[in-house]
Amino acid sequence: MEKMLVGCLLMLGQLFLVLPVDGRERPQARFPSRGRHVRMYPQTALLESSCENKRADLVFIIDSSRSVNTYDYAKVKEFILDILQFLDIGPDVTRVGLLQYGSTVKNEFSLKTFKRKSEVERAVKRMRHLSTGTMTGLAIQYALNIAFSEAEGARPLRENVPRIIMIVTDGRPQDSVAEVAAKARNTGILIFAIGVGQVDLNTLKAIGSEPHKDHVFLVANFSQIESLTSVFQNKLCTVHMCSVLEHNCAHFCLNTPGSYICKCKQGYILSTDQKTCRIQDLCATEDHGCEQLCVNMLGSFVCQCYSGYTLAEDGKRCTAVDYCASENHGCEHECVNAESSYLCRCHEGFALNSDKKTCSKIDYCASSNHGCQHECVNAQTSALCRCLKGFMLNPDRKTCRRINYCALNKPGCEHECVNTEEGHYCRCRQGYNLDPNGKTCSRVDHCAQQDHGCEQLCLNTEESFVCQCSEGFLINDDLKTCSRADYCLLSNHGCEYSCVNTDKSFACQCPEGHVLRSDGKTCAKLDSCALGDHGCEHSCVSSEDSFVCQCFEGYILRDDGKTCRRKDVCQDVNHGCEHLCVNSGESYVCKCLEGFRLAEDGKRCRRKNVCKSTQHGCEHMCVNNGNSYLCRCSEGFVLAEDGKHCKRCTEGPIDLVFVIDGSKSLGEENFETVKHFVTGIIDSLAVSPKAARVGLLQYSTQVRTEFTLRGFSSAKEMKKAVTHMKYMGKGSMTGLALKHMFERSFTQVEGARPPSTQVPRVAIVFTDGRAQDDVSEWASKAKANGITMYAVGVGKAIEEELQEIASEPIDKHLFYAEDFSTMGEISEKLKEGICEALEDSGGRQDSAAWDLPQQAHQPTEPEPVTIKIKDLLSCSNFAVQHRFLFEEDNLSRSTQKLFHSTKSSGNPLEESQDQCKCENLILFQNVANEEVRKLTQRLEEMTQRMEALENRLKYR
């Protein structure tokens, strides 16, 4: 009775202290929050006593996305510090870890990091805002896999130490949370989910433990999160409810902070009353890979098969039983498996007998003639209809028709074919007789059989004959005799000049000096070619009124109609020539393109080795280039003006920075060509700390320093770094890269020599397309500060942008190529330009090598030596006010050495220094902090713009 009273008092106290998120309607304070209702929690004083001797492993997970501003982030830290106040923190009581997340997860400290509450509080105060994305699921996964591992300080599960996650978030996650949160809860982790502002309530419920009214909380803003402190003190410090209440759990009672939940044994699930348990039907939700039947068992399942099937060795698939495998069961023909037994089957054309095993041939015509007009005949597998002699089967395969032998056999009768009962014969038309071959016909010759009386010709007709006259004669009235015909008597038949009778007809004649035209009637003047060749190169041929020129065989007439040229034998076919087919007389020869020679077969072509066959005169190396060659120089040399001899670059100092476009329009294959281009330039320089210093930037949507001017002291190391350079492959922010180069790459911190040394500063900017930002501002600043700018563009590079980048004169500092095949020529010209710059500098050597010069501040460049660490340490007030800057964790090794050497040197640095200097340093620090803040704000705005731009490009 006493336990029940205590439990009721505790639960009553919670009802007054906490108003958690719940699906049921409860009285709640409401206020506007963009159209949503958010629950207000009352401010309740903390309990006087802490959670003494309370053993727990507690991990805070804090949303550090960009949507959380600086003020709200400070409120979250205050909330954590308030929670820590009532916890008994120590290795044997409560252990505390903390993660914060954005696009990635940052482990601020693990469960084993700190042993005292003061250490945890100090770490919370030093946390820095990540200000990136919202990967909530990733943070929970990290806590499950790493933060609660024994290696990170979590106590073993066998010790039954509660594992608790307290997660604070203010927005919709960018990844999935439900599955990973459920997995964490199933391992025994208790999750409190706290939402601030416009958080989706369903998302919070997917994260938090059940019942949601005890583990899911929602407040309007970060200022109200402190109202939850007392709620969590009650939940984290309460006694075990299972021991003081009549819980009525059917199987197990599990304590939760301030409450309890019922759990079931393996193979059972909790009923809707949240107390009783029922057997879990594992087959109800999925078949578990069972091919046919899934049968539920207590805590498990088995796969079973239908009748006629057996379970395979994998326990899931089913195989049909082969009843005919061992014997044919007396079947005469075939044994066939049925669903749960077997049956006998006969071959085609046979039927199964009554014993269901033997077979008999089928008599298809016994019961019916199947509609056959003449005869029904049994075949192998069916009945066929057959016709009597002299008949053939119709397309219906049943009725018959008389055979048309004349149509079927095509006997070749010249006139007519006549069918008979069993065959056919040929017959001739009237006036014809059948020839002995029985097929062809001959006309009856009436003229040969009787005396017809015809004077000249007798002509057979269909049934008799007629007399006819020879050509040039006409039949007389007796129809037998003939008289010569006068064709010109009645008409001149269209003759232009005169009509003359001939033996058989007439002919037109022309006067002297004329010839008859092809129409046989009109006349033309005599042959035009007889008077001259009329300029015809080969032959002149007269036409009706004039002439035409013709060419000999193998030639064709040109457009002038007079001269001739040889036929193009290569026009329609190349005759197997690999490169070119060229006409040669009346034949052809094969020829090759420049840079190639003809092979022995006279058709294929082989590349010429011009360097091998020519006295090229190259001092170092000869390289074939089509039908010509190029001279190249060894490492450290450049080509002289004659294009053949080589000269060494002056080994003077130079600070050279490559700015390389790594955008996706370039492509990985061309990026390799650019890397060869860079190493070629490096080969022409005497790389050392005192001579040539080289740095390299790669850019796309961001700028990446591959190595600085002080990165390498030898060409070998530098070329190796270029070879291993990774392709970025995104946008093209050339202006951003020029800004980075101007502000950072040529600073003494990154290895540049100060302007006072007058060491030439050279930048080689390579790009293959239009920049996505402005290049003119930073290109102008770089040139104004003495940096010689070379612009190299390939492909789609914009000439106007290249001109804005390049130094004057443009023709010496701008190089453009349509493709990457001419990069070698550009490389040689660049080497010459760089060598000229070295020669103009007079071969000066930089004695400072890699050390930073200890000189006065140069007004033209914001070098980091303007204010040194030892100057800061000399100002005691500044050092005390900003002691965080000089703690061990925040100083580099070099700064620590300087600090200790200053203290041990015995110099009067503290009070003897000029106080004005200290005040100036503090003023500078304030101004610098303000500038850093402005730059940070601009960087955030630029980052947002870049992300929006990348998203637009992604979905184009």
From Swiss-Prot:
Residues 57-232, 655-830 form the VWFA domain. Residues 1-23 form the signal peptide. It comes from the Eukaryota. GO terms for cellular component: basement membrane; collagen-containing extracellular matrix; extracellular matrix; extracellular space; matrilin complex. Pfam families: EGF_CA (PF07645), FXa_inhibition (PF14670), Matrilin_ccoil (PF10393), VWA (PF00092). The keyword Disulfide bond applies. Involved in matrix assembly. This is Matrilin-2. It comes from Mus musculus.
